[in-house]
């Protein structure tokens, strides 16, 4: 499919039908071919092999064009702010089987996590939080500071064989556990929690579950209803193919009023706002009156969010859903299998559980400087940490990219 066919397919969004019964969530017509891999949809320079989407995912061409149009509108004397911010939320909601009313914008994943922990009013009580060492390091810093500053009881389960055993979680979750906080897919090695099993365990002991889904949303099927997860958050610059400064927070509808306390306030939470001091205003006891929106927006959004990123997501979220998350998930499995077979033969031992199907696979590494030099010479981009190497293929990668990586390390 050429670029014109792609753009035409995306332009058809305006006339598409509602998908999955969720208002505002639409999909292009089924005649558009979205087979994988999709190299032509991305402007990755010729000769460069990028297998590092768990770090930052490249924008597809349609997203880049949307951002260009937005930037042009910002330089115009007549500002065009035309975009449907609620439609973008509906698209994300459909991606994880949530209701749009359960979704709010946040600047990033960490803000979402802070809103949940603060809203549950855990600090200053005898309650505890359970997490694990494969959770996002920024979240572990957050919980560690709460422990240091306020004495919060934080219980961290350590991995065994590079996975978190549900039985180890079971040993530390008790009736005083207020929150179980995990990454659905671990950023370090791609370990995947069985989200439903974790939720069933936590709920059986009266605890809630927060999941960081940044390394899963857009590449791994997520069903918040089926899993029972209470809260989830992610930024959009990774597998949602968006940009920095914008993310989503999911809060289960029945917990909005009953459990999660509102901890910040701002005008974006108002469903209606009325002045009472201007000419022609109705009289009032105060200069302003307002009604808060009853949904997640009315609880957690404070002010303006990243408009440029929202424009990008207007293109990328329908793009992801048209390809199909299940197809994205299936596409990478032969690539992961090849890596896990060949990398150990080259001296890179796997630290990803063999049953993992996530988009991340990692390997131990010696002589970092030599590895960096080899990859640089071959124009291959993967994450090289101090003592491990992480590979994360996406929709534009194929077996040729994997072979180029293997050749560079041979």
Regions found by a protein language model. Give the residues of each.
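Pyridoxal 5′-phosphate
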Residues: 7-410
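Twin-arginine (Tat) signal peptide motif
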Residues: 1-7
